[in-house]
Regions:
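Alpha-helical membrane segments and immediately flanking helix-loop junctions
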Residues: 13-22, 151-158
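Single conserved hydrophobic/aromatic residue that forms the stacking wall/gate
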Residues: 1-15
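Short, flexible active-site loop motifs that bind/organize anionic cofactors or intermediates
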Residues: 1-4, 23, 141
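Hydrophobic alpha-helical transmembrane segments
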Residues: 34-173
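Membrane-interface alpha-helices at helix entry/exit sites of multi-pass transporters
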Residues: 18-28, 32-35, 101-105
């Protein structure tokens, strides 16, 4: 359900203690800030994608979605899970990737970039990497790890940054 609260929720919360932040994030109800965030996400996604010609928008989505998922998946190699395994919502805690899994993940992330019509659009891939780095640094400072919610938010924001970079490149060439 949707719930309005006078304070922020999760990572942006005014609380400083890791335990309190994680307790708030464990609540599966979406708050008013979550609703506002989703409205901004879908609005910005629509504005960015619709500002491109249809063929280019299709290429951006086909390349950007899997690339950003690959970038975001690296969160498990940079940060530990922030909760104890028995406290996880779905009782699943991911372990770091082996070298083989890491290489396979990188290959799978980069292969869809072949959909891009010109090599200059590869520069859009820098944006999600920078976004991922700053978000994971923030998570490390606030909760000393990641949660499933953090993974989802990292993907969505990385994806938006890819489309922003793509549109910037399109408008400058």
């Amino acid at each position: 359900g949707i719930r309005s609260q006078p304070r922020s929720r999760g990572l942006g919360d005014v609380y400083k203690r890791q335990e309190r932040i994680l307790a708030i994030m464990k609540d599966s109800h979406i708050g008013s800030y979550g609703v506002i965030g989703l409205i901004f996400y879908f609005g910005l996604f629509y504005l960015l994608v619709s500002s491109l010609p249809i063929e280019l928008a299709g290429c951006a989505i086909l390349a950007g979605d899997p690339f950003c998922k690959g970038v975001s998946s690296m969160i498990i190699n940079r940060l530990p899970y922030a909760r104890k395994e028995e406290e996880a919502k779905n009782k699943t805690v991911y372990s770091r990737m082996t070298s083989r899994e890491y290489v396979f993940s990188i290959i799978c992330a980069f292969l869809p970039l072949l959909w891009l019509p010109q090599p200059v659009y590869l520069l859009a891939g820098i944006f999600p990497v920078i976004t991922w780095y700053f978000l994971t640094s923030f998570m490390k400072r606030k909760i000393q790890g990641y949660t499933g919610d953090c993974c989802g938010a990292t993907f969505l924001l990385s994806e938006l940054s890819f489309y922003m970079g793509f549109v910037i490149i399109y408008q400058t060439i």
